A protein has these predicted regions:
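N-terminal secretory signal peptides that target proteins for export/translocation
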Residues: 1-27
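Bacterial N-terminal signal peptides
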Residues: 30-41
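N-terminal, active-site-proximal structural segment of metallo-dependent hydrolase catalytic domains
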Residues: 44-252, 268, 281-303, 538-539, ...
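Metal-dependent phosphoester-hydrolase catalytic domains
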Residues: 47-105, 260-265, 317, 340-341, ...
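Short coil/turn segments at beta-strand junctions that form active-site/ligand-binding loops
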Residues: 116, 171, 325-326, 358-360
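Active-site flanking residues adjacent to catalytic metal/cofactor-binding acidic residues
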Residues: 122, 178, 332, 364-367
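Active-site environment of divalent metal-dependent phosphoester hydrolases
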Residues: 127-128, 182-185, 212-215, 273, ...
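Catalytic-adjacent loop/helix segments of enzymes that bind and process anionic phosphate/sulfate esters
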Residues: 238-239, 246-250, 257-345
């Protein structure tokens, strides 16, 4: 095999292809099962205390291969296909089979809190390591055995922490997940959300964020210009697909031991990046940025032509222990290909949408708080951006007059790395090192809902898993400096580039009145970052670490 083949083979993780039912068979079988359920059971749903039904199972109509090809090749498609795509991007998959099979919430009894709702959030990087993720979430002994059997095992001293983190996974009543594939070759055409939910015996909802239509994904990429015949055939084999198994779905999910109701899929009105036209037309400057990113971090960035955009998956849980008897879960994923200002706009849109909700709610997901401008640039916009940047003018004289520009660059990079990448909530230094994400967190902290409540930014030493206080430490684990980071990119030289990208924000009963009753009821506590589990095997489970929080169902005194 050529070097190119070995590189691509590892990058795309081409492994065995699991045999799964074809789309047509699934459709026919689904109709038969639905008909049988109606015959055997007069109701395929169950009544809730709120007078509504729990939907047993529903999903939108999926696209077939020829429709995916049309969506790839034609910017404007026929109205029926456009309508089908729109329905797919706004209609959630809902499955409460676990509830109908007897699954009930665990409500772990947490020391110092009592019975609690434990929530986990995790970007699982498409589900590339799905089998090991399932193992970590369901079989502690099996996962530890695999970790110790690996050639580079250095984990034996970490068993206690690994077990503690896996206990969190296995006792969670709600799991919010980003980046789940369904019908993609890179993940063996598997329905990642369904497999994981089945393994955990949990109800689930799935919202499509993108329909992947890049020519590479659909097996349409031509390699006729590759002169070496062996390499060309290898590429053609790597990018070939089984057309009857490709569904092209990529999205967000909520898994829950509580049954799910009032499930909604709401795309952002403000889409900061056009993943269809933008990926087809990136220009010279952007190509340079991509090369630079690869050089700095060793990150392989490839074109991703997609239909769809960033979205919000919302669901209501019936939690009778709380005054309103319900909790709203919002799973979100903010845009990475934009400026911090673009993410602020998306966050504001989300907050305004959920502002009327009076019961407790949790917002969880990959917020992409890199502090970086990941937007597509062209030469003109790059020049304009420089001219409008006061920080550039403040350092321009130093760079050109004294020759210490490199020192300034390194100092600025080090300051940002140590402070903002690990703690995007930190205050910046105007001109020298402003914090690009500062407005994001300021706006969240100042926001007030219609009932007078606010997002809980508290950091109590006694409610921290490691005894550290500070902004948001109750809901997101802090380190000695900043937060425990959740995302890493391997670099060619030195340590990994690490960032805090994934967040849990909780709105419960906290108001501006210090005498508010129940201000610690359902308030976040004992936040964890499960980075040890994520890194326990030679191949990380994801490029993101999972995070968790405990939410007490009764009032606590602190």
């Amino acid at each position: 095999m050529t070097k190119l083949g070995r590189f691509l083979g590892e990058h795309f993780k081409t492994v065995r292809l699991l045999n799964e039912d074809r789309v047509g068979v699934v459709a026919v079988t689904g109709r038969f099962v639905l008909l049988l359920a109606c015959i055997l059971s007069p109701k395929a749903s169950a009544q809730t205390d709120h007078g509504t039904d729990y939907i047993r199972s529903s999903q939108p109509t999926l696209l077939i291969y020829t429709e995916l090809v049309a969506l790839s090749q034609q910017e404007t498609v026929d109205p029926p296909l456009a309508a089908k795509l729109q329905t797919l991007l706004t209609t959630p998959f809902i499955n409460n089979e676990a509830y109908f099979s007897g699954t009930k919430p665990l409500r772990p009894d947490v020391e110092g809190l009592g019975p609690s709702l434990r929530l986990v959030e995790w970007n699982i990087e498409r589900g590339m390591e799905l089998d090991d993720i399932k193992l970590a979430m369901t079989d502690k002994e099996g996962f530890l055995a695999k970790a110790h059997a690996e050639p580079n095992d250095k984990k034996k001293t970490m068993d206690k922490e690994l077990i503690a983190q896996m206990d969190v996974f296995q006792s969670a009543d709600v799991i919010v997940l980003n980046e789940l594939d369904w019908g993609m070759k890179r993940t063996d055409y598997r329905a990642v959300v369904k497999e994981l939910a089945d393994a955990l015996k949990m109800n689930w909802a799935y919202g499509i964020e993108f329909v992947e239509v890049d020519p590479k994904v659909l097996g349409l990429q031509s390699f006729a210009n590759v002169k070496d015949e062996a390499e060309r055939k290898e590429l053609e084999n790597l990018f070939s697909v089984e057309k009857n198994r490709v569904l092209g779905l990529h999205g967000t999910a909520i898994l829950s031991r509580y049954p799910l109701r009032d499930v909604k899929l709401v795309p952002f009105k403000y889409q900061a990046y056009d993943w269809y036209n933008g990926e087809k037309k990136y220009g010279t400057v952007e190509a340079g940025k991509r090369k630079g990113a690869s050089l700095l971090f060793g990150e392989e960035i490839v074109r991703e032509v997609r239909r769809g955009g960033r979205t919000n998956l919302m669901a209501t849980l019936d939690v009778p222990e709380l005054p309103q008897g319900q909790v709203t879960i919002i799973a979100t994923h903010l845009e990475n290909r934009t400026t911090p200002k673009g993410r602020v706009q998306q966050a504001t849109e989300l907050l305004d949408m959920i502002r009327p909700i009076r019961n407790p709610l949790v917002i969880a997901g990959d917020m992409n708080t890199t502090g970086a401008d990941g937007s597509v640039l062209n030469i003109k916009s790059a020049v304009v951006k420089k001219l409008n940047d006061p920080g550039w003018w403040a350092t321009k004289g130093i760079k050109y007059a004294t020759g210490v520009g490199l020192v300034m660059d390194l100092a600025t990079f080090g300051f940002k790395t140590a402070k903002f990448q690990a703690d995007p909530t930190a205050s910046g230094v105007p001109l020298l090192a402003p914090n690009p994400e500062e407005n994001f967190f300021d706006d969240l902290q100042k926001y007030r809902f219609d009932d007078g409540s606010r997002i809980d930014f508290r950091g109590d030493e006694k409610l921290s898993v490691n005894g550290r206080d500070g902004t948001l430490s109750n809901s997101n684990e802090r380190a000695k400096k900043g937060f425990v980071t959740t995302f890493s990119l391997p670099r060619t030289l030195g340590e990994k580039g690490k960032f805090k990208l994934d967040w849990i924000f909780v709105k419960a009963y906290l108001t501006d009145d210090p005498k508010t009753v129940d201000s610690y009821r359902f308030a976040p506590a004992f936040a964890r970052t499960m980075d040890d589990v994520n890194e326990a095997l030679d191949e990380p489970l994801s490029d993101h670490a999972a995070i968790s929080v405990d939410l007490p169902l009764s009032q606590q005194s602190h």
